[in-house]
Amino acid sequence: MRYHKIYPAAVCFCAYLIAIGVILGDPAEILPGLLKIIMTEDALITDYVKIAGIGAAFVNAALVTLISLGILRLSEDPLNGFTLVEIGLMAGFALFGKNIANIWPIILGTFLYAKLRREPFGKYASVSLLSTSLAPVVSYVALDNGWGNIWWAIFIGAVIGFVLPPLSAYTYKIQNGMNLYNMGFACGLLATILVPVMTSLGAKPNVAHHWATGYNTELGICLGGLCLVLILTGLLFSGRPVWAAWAGYRRLLLTTGRAPSDYLRMFGVAPTLINMGVNGLIGMAFILLSGGDLNGPTLGGIFTIMGFSAFGKHARNLTPIMLGVVLGSFCMHWNINDSAVQLALLFGTTLAPISGYFGWPFGILAGFLHSSVVLRAGTPVEGFNLYNNGFSGGLLAIVLYPIITEAIRHRRPELQEADYLEDVFEQDSPTIPPPIFKKR
């Protein structure tokens, strides 16, 4: 089995998360904190560090990641770059929205979908994990806030998990590989229908805002250490000469990042690890330099960036997006250090392929537009879609791709309207990278 070291490395990552929780938090408060996480509504923005303490938040992240690894291993999901995406997403969002209880009904629904189609669950295991973007719906219904109960929560969660595989397969194609958080777009569409129906039946969901502050030094040291370990491992301990690892990373920077771009299969372990570490440092630098906070949500955003560093993101295509969000802070009626904008700064890098494919000026434009669109995209779904930036990114990708393509076609005749992928579900076969276009 290729990339067999992913599982041991991921377990070490989980152990690191637990160590952070135990060292920075009070061990005696971890179990009560985990119970509080389970018994709390998880709509955006619910920072587990704020409501349950840093110890419980990081232990929850480790447990959710271990559960995800177990599902991937038992289902024999093929190991590739997208496996690292799943690890980053599940660990990151387990700091603000996903917990060891609310993810199960959705996973069950996808499992039933695979059984109905008489296909191996391994084909849909990654979809089942990503579908937990709507885990806050399960928590809301299960906690019986005058509407619903645990059985309705299991049923609704299973329905969500059941319908998202075909829906996400369709939405993947219409975005032309320009939105990396495809599941966020699919979940946003589903939530746009689901939440109004729930409201019509008597539900009264409320958008939350729990945001921890004061952890920049501690979490900055922990995150910076993790990123440096990844970079040094890629350079020195990956079985390749340092010059070869660095040369591979430089070639990686020339790609567009258009989905699907599996960097692990395209360039190998060393350049991918370097890319993950560098991008993590970039994300942390933007947050700290803009006066933001390192906490559950922002650390979740950085973990997501690091995960997608194995599947489309690199320094050259994500930096213009982030600069576009910063530019928006000088023009719009909001501040760059507002909590929602800090998340847009990190998660807006879902549009990194636009920057890589069309050029950095269009990346800045996409980031600029995203910084405003995302602030309103979550309103119809009451914060129930954790991947709200993916929903906003999908809307912008669908609008911007044909407009930009048509606008610059006379200078870039090689641009094509047709998508080049047919199968959204990851398989363990070689990936052909998208063409790299250079200015003539």
Task: List PLM regions with ranges.
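Short, highly charged, low-complexity non-transmembrane loops/tails of multi-pass membrane proteins
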Residues: 213-214, 248-255, 410-431
